[in-house]
Amino acid sequence: LEDKSFNLTELISELVRERKAEARVKMNCPEHINIPLHHTATRELCAILLDNSLKHSPKNSVVKIRIIPSKQNITVNFINDGTISQQTLPHVFERFFRGNQSAKGYGLGLPLAEQLTKALGGQISVSTSKNSTIFTISLPIL
């Protein structure tokens, strides 16, 4: 993937505006985070995780997005008030797996997010508690 420097905070803000989700998303992000990664792949990755967070959290809850920069990588957390069962958790990145069979979708979003993260040289993980779920991506910026 060809890298091009862009502002990650701006990219995520744009995704939130496109979904008309400003009232449901709270961003805790530095204003200017320029990263040298593939723009289209990063945009698709963040779109999948934002959409997933909005889709699987209670209707009037707030999705939180936090960007944490360091010298070698950038970490982005997508935090929502939905939960994932302990039985479901190990399978969320499997193709065609859907934890909630009544929700729309084909079970391809999170597996694609995992592939995009790996293509960008990063890591993705998920953790859940009884009150929230956090998807974390860590991407290299060197």
Predicted ranges, named:
Residues E2-R17:
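A conserved beta-strand-to-alpha-helix junction within the catalytic ATP-binding
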Residues K4, R24-P36, K71:
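Conserved catalytic submotifs in the C-terminal HATPase_c
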Residues S53-L54:
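Short helix-loop "hinge" at the ATP-lid/N-box region of the Bergerat-fold HATPase_c
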Residues N60-Q72:
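Short beta-strand/loop element within the Bergerat-fold HATPase_c
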Residues I84-F96:
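Short conserved segment of the HATPase_c
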Residues G109, A113:
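Short alpha-helical Gxxx[C/S/T] motif in the catalytic ATP-binding
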